[in-house]
Structure formats: C-alpha cells, structure tokens
C-alpha cells in the first residue's frame, strides 16, 4: 500500500509497518513506554523516545495540525495541543523527552494502529508509538521525533539501567530517595563526603504533573532534571 511518498504494510499483529520512504527501504522499530532492550544492531539507527528508526522524524511545535492514517485508509486530522513524557532504554542508553501530543477519544483511538504514519501536510513526520489514558473517554497520542528547544529531551548512558518510582504526596527528591522537604536538605549535605567510587544510578520519579530525573554516584546526586508530565506508562503497570 502507498500514501504520498511512503509504502507500508499491515503485519500479523495488526500494526502498520513502514517499508519504504522515497523508494528507499525504511526501518522502524517501536518500543513500549519505558521498555529496555539489548540489541546492538539498533544502535546504528536514530532513536527518539519510543522508537528506533532509519528515518529522521521532523521537529514539530505545539498547535501543529497533523494527519494520522486510520484503519480504513483515511487521514484523521488532529491538533498537537498537549505534552507528555516518554522514554526507552536501548543498550544502556536512556532516551527521553517531552513530546507534543494530541487528544483522541475512544472512537478515534479504535481507528488507529500502532505504527500508523503521521503527516504534516504530505510529509511523514512520525508514527503512532502508543496511547496514554487520561480520562474515561480521553487518550494522549504522543508524537515522537526531534524536539524543539523549549522542550527538554536527551540521552544518557546508564550502565545500571533506570529505576522508575512514583512520587508520594508532599515529597521532595534528592539523588535516589524521596523525603519530606524539611529532611531533604540535611540528607543532601550528608552525601557530600561519600565515597567517589560508588555505583552510578539513574532514577526517574514521577507524578501526574511532573517528572524528575536524577543521575547519582551512590547516594550523591550529580544531576537533577525537572520537567512536565504526565509519564506515558505501559499497558502493564509495573512501576512502583
């Protein structure tokens, strides 16, 4: 099947697979939210949160109108008016970012497939990687790709993977722990003289409205990032 400059097929799991772009063979491998994979062949491709691809997916700004291929072959127009956070880990590389997102209802979601190409005008700009439920009849559809400068994205080498932990109410974060605000400063000061040879770790703390990422040596915090949520979560919730 063809649309604009792409050729695509539907695989046995009912997902859409992009086979060619501009008559050049394409590779698109979609990952579950938060998934960790070990496959050295994937390192040769571009990586954006939730996808490994031979295609460079274009930078998009909020309020862009996109079109998503539906199961009947028509294009559904959607507006990017929200943001969300997604990540994956590939060969110990933590790839993360705040992504623009569209809101879809249950009826629209049922018309879309994982892997469905996403267009801006007639240009392929991304693919559907996942959905995230935010209400009884409301889902976020994140659009992954290169991020504009006003949205945080990046990648970090994480020798020991990424631990994901839900932020409890009224807690602050330092390093690998969350504590009440009146205790966090003392805890931070206590880490100043800890051994420099401790294991490094990366921890992602989350609540509905906020994401925190820390990179640490033992309990000593080296880096601390804060950005908006929500965290896109997998269908099977395994986060604490």
UniProtKB/Swiss-Prot annotation:
Keyword Lyase tagged? no
Any GO MF annotation of the entry: 2',3'-cyclic GMP-AMP binding
Q: What class of enzyme is it?
A: hydrolase
Q: Give the EC number(s) under which this enzyme is classified.
A: 3.1.-.-
Query: Which Pfam families does the annotation name?
Result: Baculo_p26 (PF04766)
Q: Where is this site: Substrate binding?
A: 93, 146, 226
Q: Which InterPro entries match?
A: Poxin_vir
Reaction(s) catalyzed by this protein? Answer: 2',3'-cGAMP + H2O = Gp(2'-5')Ap(3') + H(+)
Keyword entries, A-Z: Hydrolase, Nuclease
Query: Could you say which protein family the record assigns here?
Result: Belongs to the poxin family.
Summarizing the function annotation, the protein's role is: Nuclease that cleaves host 2',3'-cGAMP.
Entry remark concerning the domains of this protein = The substrate binding site is formed by the N-terminus of a monomer and the C-terminus of the opposite monomer.
Subunit composition and interactions: Homodimer.
Name the HAMAP family for this protein. Answer: Poxins
Q: What is the official name of this protein in its record?
A: Poxin
The species this protein was found in: Bombyx mori nuclear polyhedrosis virus
